[in-house]
């Protein structure tokens, strides 16, 4: 069974989207406690915290995306953004690297870890 990889930007965007859904579900669960205003308010506040956290993550990935290196994918020919030493094309999932040492090697996300000096 092979590992399913995704580009880093898409992973972070998916995480932010999941925070939105979690926040809405938590707030919806709060409606079941309408008889207890304190518990309902706590659920609504926790749900709102998830939504605010999602907004912060979206803002962060937006600023990170503006600084990402844009490259043309050799496989599909579309412009994609790279974060780190290795990443995948957002469109066709072709492994990409800007590091000459890693060209031709099997794709592994561990290449993005900080090197020990």
Swiss-Prot record:
One of its GO terms (cellular component) is plasma membrane. It is a multi-pass membrane protein. The keyword Transport does not apply. Keywords: Cell membrane, Membrane, Transmembrane, Transmembrane helix. It comes from the Bacteria. The keyword Protein biosynthesis does not apply. The chain crosses the membrane at residues 12-32, 42-62. It is found in: Cell membrane. Belongs to the UPF0295 family. This is UPF0295 protein GK0479. It comes from Geobacillus kaustophilus (strain HTA426). The lineage of its organism: Bacteria, Bacillati, Bacillota, Bacilli, Bacillales.
